[in-house]
Amino acid sequence: MKKQNNLRSLAAQAVEQVVEQGQSLSNVLPPLQQKVADKDKALLQELCFGVLRTLSQLEWLINKLMSRPMTGKQRTVHYLIMVGFYQLLYTRVPPHAALAETVEGAVSIKRPQLKGLINGVLRQFQRQQETLLNEFATSDARFLHPGWLVKRLQNAYPTQWQRIIEANNQRPPMWLRVNRTHHTRDGWLGLLEDAGMKGYPHPDYPDAVRLETPAPVHALPGFAEGWVTVQDASAQGCAVFLAPQNGEHILDLCAAPGGKTTHILEVAPEADVLAVDIDEQRLSRVYDNLKRLGMKATVKQGDGRYPAQWCGEQQFDRILLDAPCSATGVIRRHPDIKWLRRDRDIAELAQLQAEILDAVWPRLNPGGTLVYATCSVLPEENRDQIKAFLQRTPDAALSETGTPDQPGQQNLPGGEEGDGFFYAKLIKK
């Protein structure tokens, strides 16, 4: 079996597992990457991310070109046809190769009898492409988002919702964080230029650099030595608002995969940091990040709602709560989020966030700082959440971020800027 032929069927299987089984692409893709040659890994990733980014359009096309959906054991073929559409619409794969390889993918998934059907649908699309795309441009599916999310964005951002959706449908820029314990940002930018690459500093976040062109991490000067970390600019705002100091006791709650834990330690290398996350598997990445950067923190598995279970009676000078959320601010990085989330999830997440906030607030010392952060753009998880918390928590005061009526700072995703992110800085009276 040819590796290239197998590639399309692997992409179809990955997308099927996300859409039909609710699995995260970050869990599904790595084992499939192991099945292809190194030279094909980037294309497999591109096909998976691309199909999930444009799923609404590809589904719309299938409904137009097929009289009945593929179901049961033939369901993977449904997604294989989507992979074919995506290649024809969005990649540089020559059309004849895209057709041939996609049709051959039917053999890999043990549906060789459907090769003719796949070929026919893809060729019909080629013949009718212009007409179909003109019709699609006026359909509800053109936003490439589920309807419930479009409605929420329209309600929350009456004048900005289309800009948010457009940003979500773009490829994200690659942001890095320079480790200030090794280099100044300007110094590392010089090393980057020496390596033949160009980067741009962020105006607000002092360690953030955007690469002109995304690059593999092994090509970045000093990555293995811990000089630089891949982290979106907006995520770097957490440590900026937290402003950790040496010698302080700091809690990083919901810490995995450890990007913010290590940023705290870069800013305050002598801080005593406890990193806690409920997901034991993801905690392994916290250890990996600490090891690569040569840093030490206490790492524990635990549920943020029950601090006594993982820190006893310990109190903290600063707490970073990067709360579990809908992740609607990072859709451009994780397009599977659009299809993994459901409308009902938002109220459940808001309830969980409130429970964690109420549980950890008593662990903050008087005069201490808590930064509440999410990678969401939805008010229920952000401004509304903090407004309600301030109303029920008399010893909490807002600092630097917004006003009591409009608490927090909401970053929206866009262009070369950072992801969608929310921060509220709270001081204990």
UniProtKB/Swiss-Prot annotation:
Where do the record's region annotations for Disordered lie?
397-419
Alphabetized InterPro entries for the sequence: MeTrfase_RsmB-F_NOP2_cat, MeTrfase_RsmB-F_NOP2_dom, NusB-like_sf, NusB_RsmB_TIM44, RCMT, rRNA_ssu_MeTfrase_B, rRNA_ssu_MeTfrase_B_ent, RsmB-like_ferredoxin
> What does the record list as GO biological process?
regulation of DNA-templated transcription; rRNA base methylation
Q: Where is the composition biased (Polar residues)?
A: 400-412
Q: What class of enzyme is it?
A: transferase
Q: Where does S-adenosyl-L-methionine bind?
A: 254-260, 277, 303, 322
Tell me yes or no: is Methyltransferase among this UniProt entry's keywords: yes
Q: What is its EC number?
A: 2.1.1.176
Q: Which GO terms describe its molecular function?
A: RNA binding; rRNA (cytosine-C5-)-methyltransferase activity
- Is rRNA processing one of the keywords UniProt gives this record? yes
The listed locations are: Cytoplasm
Question: Cellular component GO terms, alphabetically?
Answer: cytosol
Membrane-traversing stretches:
none
PROSITE patterns linked: NOL1_NOP2_SUN (PS01153), SAM_MT_RSMB_NOP (PS51686)
Give me the reactions it catalyses. cytidine(967) in 16S rRNA + S-adenosyl-L-methionine = 5-methylcytidine(967) in 16S rRNA + S-adenosyl-L-homocysteine + H(+)
Q: Which UniProt keywords apply?
A: Cytoplasm, Methyltransferase, RNA-binding, rRNA processing, S-adenosyl-L-methionine, Transferase
Domain of life, per lineage:
Bacteria
Catalytic positions are: 375
**A Pfam short name:** NusB
User: Which CDD domains does UniProt cross-reference here?
Assistant: AdoMet_MTases, Methyltransferase_Sun
What is the recorded function of this protein according to its Swiss-Prot or TrEMBL entry? Specifically methylates the cytosine at position 967 (m5C967) of 16S rRNA.
Which PANTHER family does the protein's record reference?
NOL1_NOP2_SUN FAMILY PROTEIN _ ANTITERMINATION NUSB DOMAIN-CONTAINING PROTEIN (PTHR22807:SF61), NOP2 YEAST -RELATED NOL1/NOP2/FMU SUN DOMAIN-CONTAINING (PTHR22807)
Family note = Belongs to the class I-like SAM-binding methyltransferase superfamily. RsmB/NOP family.
Which NCBIfam families does the entry link to? Answer: PRK10901.1 (NF008149), PRK14902.1 (NF011494), rsmB (TIGR00563)
Question: Would you tell me the protein name for this molecule?
Answer: Ribosomal RNA small subunit methyltransferase B
The organism of origin for this protein: Salmonella agona (strain SL483)
